[in-house]
Amino acid sequence: MSIAQQLMDMGFPADKAEAAAGNNRNLDQALDWIEKDGAGVPMETDAPAQAAPGAADSGAPPVAASFKCDDCGKLLANDDAIMFHASKTKHENFSESSEAIKPLTAEEKAAKVLEIREKIKVHQAKKAKLEAEENREKEKKRREDGKAMISHKEAARDREIREAAQDRRREKNEDEIARKRVLEQIRLDKEARKAKASGQPVPEAKPAPSAAPVAPPKDYSTTTLQFRLLDGQTVRQQFEANEPLAMVRAWVETNHANGVPFTLMTPFPRKVFTEDDMGTPLKVLNLVPSANVILNRAA
């Protein structure tokens, strides 16, 4: 935020705030300029220009010495003071007044500057507190996303271990079937040799029935999602079918979003996912055993 904007936030008129912030002054320098020059202070009690002596006797119409707020009775020096007073109090009724405003003394002006400095300190303290709260929220979200990614990696590792165990069991079963087939063939060969040696007819060798291929069960414990990213590229990633959509979003946000806000949707059937869907498992959202997911920039 610029120095001039900070001064305007504290109640200075725009033109005077710009003047105080000129020459690349920082906030303290601008306040020093205000304190010495006085032109930038949004005082409602600045003294108006005094009419020349005898002006009332010249026959000219009287010149207003000040302006008065008809809502509260406060005397105001000029248009800037009227606008400043109206913005603070929401008062709307003003009129000219012949009553002159007593000029501020040097001590009163210095006290006014100190008062404004104190207001600026309060404003800066509030701003610093707000920034600290925002930083805490960002850090909290970063940690939550990190925990979600760790949980996802652990789930992926467990899934790989289960799949490896399934592969080992399948290989063991296949080896056992092959071993039984070899033993059966050896038995048949022995019987054939015995029959031939005894002059008996050799029994017709019947091929051992091959094990019927067993169709692998449909395992929908996992799903493969293909993402079309914001830059048009596509990537694939596997997730647990019972994982919530929030895990998918966390993975995309960490690896491919590059800090750009986004939404998730499926093209067929078309569905745009909202915050209400983040806790729903992928299986319930019909994203199993595979699905296409498109990233769109958030509005």
From Swiss-Prot:
A GO term for molecular function: K48-linked polyubiquitin modification-dependent protein binding
Positions of the UBX domain: 218-295
SUPFAM superfamilies membership: UBA-like, Ubiquitin-like
GO cellular component term, pick one: nucleus
PROSITE patterns assigned to the protein according to its UniProt record, in alphabetical order: UBX, ZINC_FINGER_C2H2_1
Stored Pfam families: UBX
Stretches with biased composition (Basic and acidic residues): 128-176
Compositionally skewed regions (Low complexity) per UniProt: 46-61, 201-213
GO BP of this protein: cell differentiation; IRE1-mediated unfolded protein response; masculinization of hermaphroditic germ-line; negative regulation of proteasomal ubiquitin-dependent protein catabolic process; negative regulation of protein K48-linked deubiquitination; negative regulation of protein ubiquitination; positive regulation of protein catabolic process; spermatogenesis
UniProt main location, coarse: cytoplasm
Chain segments annotated as coiled-coil in the UniProt record: 111-179
Disordered, as annotated region: 39-61, 127-176, 191-218
Keywords from the named record: Coiled coil, Cytoplasm, Differentiation, Spermatogenesis
Knockout consequences: RNAi-mediated knockdown does not cause any visible phenotype. Simultaneous RNAi-mediated knockdown of ubxn-2 and ubxn-3, causes 50 percent embryonic lethality. The surviving hermaphrodite progeny are sterile due to a lack of sperm. Abnormal accumulation of sex determination terminal factor tra-1. Germline development is normal. In males, sperm production is normal.
Disulfide bond sites: none
Signal peptide (residue range): none
Tissue: Expressed in the germline (at protein level). Expressed in spermatocytes but not in mature sperm (at protein level). Ubiquitously expressed. Predominantly expressed in the spermatheca.
Record localization: Cytoplasm, Perinuclear region
Functional note: Ubiquitin-binding protein which acts as an adapter for ATPase cdc-48.1 and/or cdc-48.2, conferring substrate specificity. Together with ubxn-2 and ubxn-3, plays a role in hermaphrodite spermatogenesis probably by promoting the degradation of sex determination terminal factor tra-1.
Subunit relationships: Interacts with cdc-48.1 (via N-terminus) and cdc-48.2 (via N-terminus) in vitro; the interaction with cdc-48.1 is not detected in vivo.
Protein name in UniProt: UBX domain-containing protein 1
Organism: Caenorhabditis elegans
